Amino acid sequence: MSESVGCCDSVSQCFFDYYTSKILIIRSKKVGTLNRFTQALVIAYVIGYVCVYNKGYQDTDTVLSSVTTKVKGIALTNTSELGERIWDVADYIIPPQEDGSFFVLTNMIITTNQTQSKCAENPTPASTCTSHRDCKRGFNDARGDGVRTGRCVSYSASVKTCEVLSWCPLEKIVDPPNPPLLADAENFTVLIKNNIRYPKFNFNKRNILPNINSSYLTHCVFSRKTDPDCPIFRLGDIVGEAEEDFQIMAVHGGVMGVQIRWDCDLDMPQSWCVPRYTFRRLDNKDPDNNVAPGYNFRFAKYYKNSDGTETRTLIKGYGIRFDVMVFGQAGKFNIIPTLLNMGAGLALLGLVNVICDWIVLTFMKRKQHYKEQKYTYVDDFGLLHNEDK
């Protein structure tokens, strides 16, 4: 019963006690120096990091962006399959337009004059045979070259494989040409047009800056030293800035990233808001894991012979895909974040006294004396009762 009463008294004291501040001036160089040093750190943090570096007085918005590209350049090839041939933008840009990216054909394996007919399958552990019984009629291997006819035929003088119904002659399993067929692609150029918007601030801009005119665009090529504002880029320079070799990358293909960053302080003149370009390779280039390297796909060009037979030229194309990625953030003065950060700074300054009190009452030699001076307990009615006497 007594424990219950004691517990109730403790709860009552906690609920009805009133705490008020008491100013205690401690004349100590150590404590004073610690107090001012801690205050200086808080002020430096609020002014230096929050206000100056992080621009805590600004409201921010993220960028909205659209990107279009236009590639130009001519390449000449001379192969046994196609002979001497000129390649222009309609030949090597596949597809003509993509969302925020473009693909440039740099190398290929060409198989000409394919028709729907029967031929021996390419030799693999699953396709080699010794008799017709090894070749199931109608079998369709997803990784094979066609539908089997049920016959085992000669692929070469020493190898037999199952006959398939497919586009014949089949594509040969060979490595891509080295050096690449379209080695001249290194000198192709691309015009990147980027329009950005910060809707919160109703701010619009594009990477073709106001100081750029049509005559300048006809001859400029991006260079960090001489033409940092030019939106026309040489493909070899893009790959080179990523510390890659274009001719090596063009053999098997790959993926490059063109990064455009718009970080704009809208409290400053609009002419200061300009794009910053960086380039990097995005696909994995690991010498210890070079299985299925690069970037490639197949496409075909169809036509009919004079006798009406449908024929196609199959191209296994290797190339470089360029992904254009836009990042950015804009800031502009706003009273609300300014007041919020000022309030947070004042709250941090209030913590300085708490820290100094804790150090004084915990680590100082005269901590007990300071504690007696710091806290005074006054009972209600007790003082009035003593005064009446």
Swiss-Prot record:
Keyword Transmembrane applies: yes
Catalytic activity reported: K(+)(in) = K(+)(out); Na(+)(in) = Na(+)(out); Ca(2+)(in) = Ca(2+)(out)
Extracellular face of the membrane: 58-343
Entry keyword annotation includes ATP-binding: yes
Cellular component terms (Gene Ontology): lysosomal membrane; membrane; monoatomic ion channel complex; plasma membrane; postsynapse; transmembrane transporter complex
Side Cytoplasmic, residues: 1-36, 365-389
GO molecular function terms attached to this record: ATP binding; ATP-gated ion channel activity; CTP binding; extracellularly ATP-gated monoatomic cation channel activity; identical protein binding; ligand-gated monoatomic ion channel activity; purine nucleotide binding; purinergic nucleotide receptor activity
Keywords tagged on the record: ATP-binding, Cell membrane, Disulfide bond, Glycoprotein, Ion channel, Ion transport, Ligand-gated ion channel, Lysosome, Membrane, Nucleotide-binding, Receptor, Transmembrane, Transmembrane helix, Transport
Segments traversing the membrane: 37-57, 344-364
Cysteines joined through disulfide linkages: C119-C168, C129-C152, C135-C162, C220-C230, C264-C273
UniProt binding sites for CTP: K70, K72, R143, T189, N296, R298, K316
Activity control mechanisms: Activated by ATP. pH-dependent and inhibited by acidic pH.
Sites where the protein binds ATP: K70, K72, T189, L191, N296, R298, K316
Localization annotation: Cell membrane; Lysosome membrane
Domain of life, per lineage: Eukaryota
Any one of the GO BP annotations: calcium ion transport
Residues with glycosylation annotation: N78, N113, N187, N213
Membrane topology label: Multi-pass membrane protein
InterPro entries: P2X4_purnocptor (IPR003047), P2X_extracellular_dom_sf (IPR027309), P2X_purnocptor (IPR001429), P2X_RECEPTOR_CS (IPR053792)
General function of this protein: ATP-gated nonselective transmembrane cation channel permeable to potassium, sodium and calcium. CTP, but not GTP or UTP, functions as a weak affinity agonist for P2RX4. Activated by extracellularly released ATP, it plays multiple role in immunity and central nervous system physiology. Could also function as an ATP-gated cation channel of lysosomal membranes.
PANTHER family: P2X PURINOCEPTOR (PTHR10125), P2X PURINOCEPTOR 4 (PTHR10125:SF18)
Family statement: Belongs to the P2X receptor family.
Quaternary structure and interacting proteins, as annotated: Functional P2XRs are organized as homomeric and heteromeric trimers. Forms homotrimer.
Name of the protein this chain belongs to: P2X purinoceptor 4a
Species in which this protein is naturally found: Danio rerio
